[in-house]
Amino acid sequence: GMGIFSTGPSFKDAKIAMDVGLNSLSVILEASKYGTFKSIPEKEIFRMEYWPLELAKVKISSQKLKGQVAVITGGLGGIGYATAKKFQKEGADVVLIDIIDPKKINLDLKGMKYIKCDITKENNVRKVFDEISTIYGGVDILISNAGFATVESLEKLSKQQFDKSFDLNLFAHHYFVKHGVEIMKNQQTRGV
């Protein structure tokens, strides 16, 4: 069998490299029906690839976060979404984690990955990071943004409200950082 392994500075670039590789393989296989494939000499490849008109097509990215995978909890809320758009503009591959159904709100999620998750359950958070690692190969930036405020005086605050507040505003952040940092340590990158 045959296979192709592609890499790139970002997930999008790696997918583009994969598409180019698969297309090239397809052309070579189709051409082999009519004869044998022989590449042009390496000197000619260099001349063709570094021809000034070819080089003019290459853009040098000024995006500071190109190739970085940013994971944001509470990504569909105001602060989370604004952060996601900024990170995306700077070139990051953005993963939004939220319990909100994006179909119920009107946000442009084009180019972003959305994962529905109740982050108050540690096992859910672990599964989300497993999924992100499978898709993107790792994590570079963690934004632990999810949270809510209970508007109630302490004397009227029920045990259930208190527990819910701590589950999301404290324990969920711990689970998120714990599992995210574990991936960063395994990658041997410092992360953000």
Predicted regions and their residues:
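Conserved glycine-rich Rossmann-like NAD(P)H-binding loop of the short-chain dehydrogenase/reductase
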Residues: 92-105
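Conserved NAD(P)H cofactor-binding loop of Rossmann-fold oxidoreductase domains
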Residues: 145-150
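The beta1-alpha1 cofactor-binding region of Rossmann-like NAD(H)/NADP(H)-dependent oxidoreductases
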Residues: 117-127, 159
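Conserved glycine-rich cofactor-binding loop
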Residues: 76-77
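Substrate-binding pocket helix/loop in short-chain dehydrogenase/reductase
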Residues: 153-154, 158-163
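A short, exposed helix-loop element centered on a Lys and neighboring polar residues
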Residues: 177-178
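Active-site loop of short-chain dehydrogenase/reductase
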Residues: 138-139, 184-192
